[in-house]
Amino acid sequence: MMDDDTELRTDGNSLLKAVWLGRLRLTRLLLEGGAYINESNDKGETALMVACITKHVDQQSISKSKMVKYLLDNRADPNIQDKSGKTALIHACIRRAGGEVVSLLLENGADPSLEDRTGASALVYAINADDKDALKHLLDACKAKGKEVIIITTDKSSSGTKTTKQYLNVPPSPKVEDRQSPPLCTTPSDVELKTSGLASPPSEKDDDFFILQTGHQSGCSTSKVLNEPGSPTRKVSSLKRARLPQLKRLQSEPWGLIAPSVLAAATRQDETHGTSTDNEVIRSINDVTFPKRGPLSRTNSIDSKDPTLFPTVQEQVLKVSASTPASWKAAYEKGQAPHPRLARRGTLPLDQEKSGMCPPGPSTLKDPASLKLLENDLYDLDIQPVGDPPNSMSLESGKGPLDRKKLNSSHLSLFHGSRESLEVVPSTSPTSVRRRPPHLLERRGSGTLLLDRIAHTRPGFLPPLNVNLNPPIPDIRASSKPASPLASGLKSMAPVAPNSPKRVDLRSKKKLLRRHSMQIEQMKQLSDFEEIMA
């Protein structure tokens, strides 16, 4: 049969014939005469493959290893594959060419990871051929390239089930039970308890438990002690585990193991809480008391401060307004009469404004008409061509409700005020100084900004982050500069304390620019009106 295969393999190729016969001189003459060393037959087999396959031996033939070495020295390619995908290395492993031939092929660049059409490499064929010498050379070559090789083949046991055998420089185990080698010393977490027949009921079967180290109970003293019969702990744990069928594991699934410490914890919980009923559980839950959370307090609120140490602005305003001279009150009543009702352009409804005003104060401020005028003075922000906001005297005498109104709406400035709204813009025009009191609201597109000078500059309170940390403390009892030309015309009606020029300059620097566009005709009318009033 070998002769028939040889005739078919050589296919009239003299080089393949010479190699198969092992004629080294003839092979050298053919190669020196111009024969192609990698020429193949109809199966795709080259001269190097034929040298690995042939078993012809006679008096004139040379050894297989010498022929392979000569072909490799003459630049024969060891990684050429035939039509079935096999290389010269695979053929050498299949035909058991020996470790020397395999070593020569590997040294000259043969790739042990190349696979044929069936997906098997030279490693698989070496294992199937039981060629340990060739397998050793293959493993050494793979480790030299930084590859760890683990080859697993499947065989069938006597019962017909597939068993797994691992070949890694060690002979395969004859039995399935010998696959697991015992460790040097087992730990308590690696040992599964198994009780004697006295501790378990007769109805229980031995397959209810999974023994991790079968046949290796003499690994160390710990496993011996835990496997002694008669221990009450083992009896209880075995009974509890018998009630848990979901903890059964197959012998072929060691990754499904559960540590005995987990089972012991479950056993202790069952012993402790086995007699408790649902009512007891509900009672225990009801008996648990949770600490009550105190009411949330605003860190920015001045009401959270100690009133004995830091009096609030409301109390200070009440004291000042209660001690207001009678001449100021009379001037306020006289000054409110000639003022026309200005257009209402507030941002809050009327009900909220009324609720925001605090009634305590001087008896003069309890008049409904004066409250109405104060509300209009506070929320009428845009200057009309025919009138201006009331004079500083009326605003000064009504500081109590105004400051309380500022405190009630101070949160609006926290949410809607931007850093741009608190920028200090110096005002050089005297009309802007007279037109705008320092404590009025300013209308912005995003909301209402409250410039609360008194609340932010009183000693004992933390100033806001975006306000000057060292502003001058204004005197509440001192009147500011008149806010409008109408107020300048009423100077003769009531005595007004003279203002300090320094204070006027400081307040004028703190003014915010009014975002109000006026036509040229309105500006002319306003200038004419100021000249008439002057």
Curated annotation (Swiss-Prot):
InterPro entries: AN34A/B/C (IPR042637), Ankyrin_rpt (IPR002110), Ankyrin_rpt-contain_sf (IPR036770). Pfam families: Ank_2. Belongs to the ANKRD34 family. The keyword Isomerase does not apply. This is Ankyrin repeat domain-containing protein 34C. The gene is Ankrd34c. SUPFAM superfamilies: Ankyrin repeat. The modification Phosphoserine is found at S301, S446. Signal peptide: none annotated. ANK repeats lie at residues 10-39, 43-80, 84-114, 118-147. Gene3D superfamilies: Ankyrin repeat-containing domain. Keywords: ANK repeat, Phosphoprotein, Repeat. The keyword Nucleus does not apply. Residues 159-205, 332-368, 384-403, 480-503 are annotated as: Disordered. It comes from Mus musculus. Coiled coil: none annotated.
